[in-house]
């Protein structure tokens, strides 16, 4: 009997050991699978060496080990306080050390030891109740990968699906639905290996009648009540999931808030813009506290996951903005949405819930059935209104307009390095799976997750200056088509202004007319020394300024400057050899030639400076260079030609239907002349390219 009992004990122990080993093996297998998915998604982002270096520089953990000088300084301070070689025998007692000190000025608090800077993304997911578990799981995996790459997300759940659901159910049922969807998001992130937490008590709402001063951007009725409810999980790598509900400040009544107001409140909190300070506080104390808040966290990204996708654009045949330079394009994009939505410049009303009291406006109900005839992210193919003709009401534009306003308001509160991304749930859930389509021609690319790609490169998945036919999606063997549709994702930055001389809105760029004065580089509007520095810094070559001015001053078509001379382009009108200058046919046969295209070295590969300049050329200056040949130029050209008997390549953007034999010969003649004469003012080594421009 004892033998039988001991045998059973050994058998049970062996079985338990096997189960533990099996569990450990399964855990290791799962961890390896997660690592594999993670590395595949990162490698699939196709970041260049320059982009990878920039990412590592921004997201590498700080060196927290104390330096030798700091250790010596601390030692000297202790020895001074204790006396020379006396140790701690004669140190001041605790009572003396903590006794009040009478000083004339307030004693500033000692700064707390700095921890690593938290890089945060603010994510808003709209209408998660419309998403199946697989898509939501994919979004959870993406947010988990962002966290592993150093970008921790704070997620706001928006239950507004555009229907009249909140009018047909009670407020309690609505809140429960939003919390239920927030719990689904938590479960999706937890399943991906990253911890998430539901935080439904962090948003406060100022009540009606309270002594409250509303300030655009800087103050709102919706605010964060306790910062540590956000920062504690973020420091531990836990993702806070916040439903769009809040508590009133005085009565602590649970009410619903618009998700956009919650996003703005979180933005203000992370940016350290609004915190409850006493009017009696010393300004230096306030300054120290704000600096401490801003050194603790950096809000790097605003990510809007919306069933409708990015911001639509009527001037792009693919239908969407790829990149929005908010400083330059916000008003144009806003007016375009108003026209397409049939709003006629009426300010949009935000859809809200009735229980939000008089602080919020209840918008007109928008039936989901009114815009679900198209798949999420698709737009109506009907053309935009022309010549002031009334457009049919499109309720989808209301959501796009709110997203555009939210992006602008958020980026206005953040440093220029911050950016925003608007994409569809399908794109946000995209991982390393094989793409359903492939791009065509020289622009062939693998399908990428826009969130991962944007974190590593600070760029959109596709360049905004690429011709539509290079963007995909289409089969490799399918011809390039101007009607090509692609993933509706919009990347936005606060950006920079673009200055064009002369302004094409008032003075269209046209070939010079005899007797009419032309713009020159010595014009007072143009800062010639800064322009020369831009060209020399970009090409790392010295420019013969006087020789260059003699050649171009009578032939300048225009100058484009991005920001504070961070990038620019100079275009000239050129004649094919053999055509007499000043003749009747000379003006008709003049070729628009991209003479210089330059970007400061510090701005190359980031910020979209080159795309901003290039897009201004083809869109604003010619609506409807002497540089090394690279893929960037090849991708943006309609076609290229290797010039015979030279080491030059000609690029041109003229559509095939507008290219007759004579125009093509004129292009070729001008480019051959420039290639042989090298009239650019300095020499370039290796392969070379010349760009001629025409209407898109």
Curated annotation (Swiss-Prot):
<keyword id="KW-0496">Mitochondrion</keyword>
<comment type="function">
    <text>N-acetylglutamate synthase involved in arginine biosynthesis.</text>
</comment>
<comment type="pathway">
    <text>Amino-acid biosynthesis; L-arginine biosynthesis; N(2)-acetyl-L-ornithine from L-glutamate: step 1/4.</text>
</comment>
<dbReference type="GO" id="GO:0005759">
    <property type="term" value="C:mitochondrial matrix"/>
</dbReference>
<dbReference type="GO" id="GO:0006526">
    <property type="term" value="P:L-arginine biosynthetic process"/>
</dbReference>
<feature type="region of interest" description="Disordered">
    <location>
        <begin position="59"/>
        <end position="84"/>
    </location>
</feature>
<feature type="domain" description="N-acetyltransferase">
    <location>
        <begin position="515"/>
        <end position="676"/>
    </location>
</feature>
<keyword id="KW-0808">Transferase</keyword>
<dbReference type="InterPro" id="IPR006855">
    <property type="entry name" value="Vertebrate-like_GNAT_dom"/>
</dbReference>
<dbReference type="InterPro" id="IPR011190">
    <property type="entry name" value="GlcNAc_Synth_fun"/>
</dbReference>
<dbReference type="GO" id="GO:0004042">
    <property type="term" value="F:L-glutamate N-acetyltransferase activity"/>
</dbReference>
<feature type="region of interest" description="Disordered">
    <location>
        <begin position="371"/>
        <end position="394"/>
    </location>
</feature>
<comment type="similarity">
    <text>Belongs to the acetyltransferase family.</text>
</comment>
<keyword id="KW-0028">Amino-acid biosynthesis</keyword>
<dbReference type="GO" id="GO:0006592">
    <property type="term" value="P:ornithine biosynthetic process"/>
</dbReference>
<protein>
    <recommendedName>
        <fullName>Amino-acid acetyltransferase, mitochondrial</fullName>
        <ecNumber>2.3.1.1</ecNumber>
    </recommendedName>
</protein>
<keyword id="KW-0809">Transit peptide</keyword>
<dbReference type="InterPro" id="IPR036393">
    <property type="entry name" value="AceGlu_kinase-like_sf"/>
</dbReference>
<dbReference type="Pfam" id="PF04768">
    <property type="entry name" value="NAT"/>
</dbReference>
<keyword id="KW-0012">Acyltransferase</keyword>
């Amino acid at each position: 009997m004892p033998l039988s009992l001991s045998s059973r004990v050994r058998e049970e122990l062996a079985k338990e050991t096997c189960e533990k080993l099996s569990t450990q093996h399964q855990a290791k297998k799962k961890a390896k699978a997660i690592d594999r998915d993670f590395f595949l998604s990162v490698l699939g982002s196709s970041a260049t060496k320059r982009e990878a270096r920039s990412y590592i520089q921004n997201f590498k953990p700080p060196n927290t080990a104390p330096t030798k000088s700091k250790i010596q300084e601390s030692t000297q301070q202790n020895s001074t306080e204790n006396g020379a070689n006396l140790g701690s025998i004669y140190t001041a007692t605790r009572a003396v050390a903590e006794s009040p000190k009478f000083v004339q000025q307030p004693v500033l608090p000692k700064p707390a030891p700095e921890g690593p800077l938290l890089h945060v993304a603010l994510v808003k997911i709209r209408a998660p109740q419309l998403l199946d578990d697989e898509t939501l799981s994919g979004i959870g995996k993406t947010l988990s990968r962002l966290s592993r790459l150093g970008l921790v997300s704070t997620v706001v759940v928006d239950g507004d699906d555009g229907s009249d659901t909140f009018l047909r159910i009670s407020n309690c049922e609505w809140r429960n639905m939003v919390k239920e969807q927030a719990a689904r998001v938590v479960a999706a992130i937890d399943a991906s290996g990253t911890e998430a937490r539901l935080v439904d008590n962090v948003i406060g709402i100022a009540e009606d009648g309270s002594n409250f001063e509303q300030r655009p951007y800087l103050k709102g009725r919706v605010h964060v009540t306790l910062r540590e409810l956000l920062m504690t999980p973020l420091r531990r790598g836990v993702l806070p999931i916040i439903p769009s509900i809040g508590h009133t400040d005085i009565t602590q009544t649970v009410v619903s808030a618009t998700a956009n107001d919650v996003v703005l409140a979180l933005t203000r909190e992370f940016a350290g813009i609004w915190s409850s300070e006493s009017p009696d506080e010393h300004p230096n104390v306030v300054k120290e506290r704000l600096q401490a808040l801003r050194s603790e966290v950096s809000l790097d990204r605003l990510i809007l996951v919306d069933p409708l996708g990015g911001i639509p654009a009527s001037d792009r045949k693919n239908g969407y903005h790829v990149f929005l330079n908010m400083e330059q394009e916000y008003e144009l994009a806003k007016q375009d949405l108003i026209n397409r939505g049939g709003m006629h410049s009426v300010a949009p009303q935000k859809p809200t819930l009735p229980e939000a009291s008089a602080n919020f406006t209840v918008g007109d109900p928008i039936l989901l059935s009114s815009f679900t005839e198209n798949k999420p992210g698709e737009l109506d193919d009907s053309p935009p209104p022309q010549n002031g003709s009334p457009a049919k009401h499109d309720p989808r534009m209301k959501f796009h307009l709110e997203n555009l306003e939210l992006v602008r308001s958020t980026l206005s509160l953040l440093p220029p390095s911050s950016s925003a991304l608007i994409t569809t749930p399908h794109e946000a859930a995209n991982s390393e799976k094989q793409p359903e389509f492939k791009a065509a021609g020289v622009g062939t690319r693998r399908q990428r997750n826009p969130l991962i790609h944007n974190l590593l490169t600070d760029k959109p998945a596709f360049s905004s200056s690429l011709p539509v036919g290079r963007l995909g999606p289409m089969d490799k063997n399918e011809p390039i088509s101007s009607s090509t549709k692609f993933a509706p994702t919009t990347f936005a930055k606060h950006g920079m202004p673009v200055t064009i001389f002369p302004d094409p809105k008032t003075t269209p760029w046209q070939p010079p007319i005899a007797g009419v004065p032309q713009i020159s580089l010595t014009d007072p509007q143009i800062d010639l020394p800064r322009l020369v520095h831009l060209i020399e810094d970009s090409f790392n070559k010295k420019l013969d300024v006087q020789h260059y001015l003699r050649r171009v001053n009578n032939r300048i078509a225009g100058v484009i400057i991005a920001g504070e001379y961070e990038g620019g382009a100079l275009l000239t009108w050129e004649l094919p050899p053999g055509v007499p200058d000043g003749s009747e046919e000379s003006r008709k046969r003049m070729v628009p030639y991209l003479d210089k295209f330059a970007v400061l070295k510090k701005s190359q590969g980031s910020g979209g400076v080159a795309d901003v300049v290039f897009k201004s050329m083809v869109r604003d200056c010619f609506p409807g260079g002497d540089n090394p040949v690279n893929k960037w130029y090849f991708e943006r050209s309609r076609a290229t030609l290797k010039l015979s008997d030279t080491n030059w390549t000609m690029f041109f953007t003229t559509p095939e239907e507008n290219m007759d034999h004579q125009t093509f010969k004129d292009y070729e003649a001008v480019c051959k002349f420039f290639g042989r004469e090298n009239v650019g003012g300095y020499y370039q080594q290796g392969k070379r390219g010349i760009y001629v421009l025409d209407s898109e």
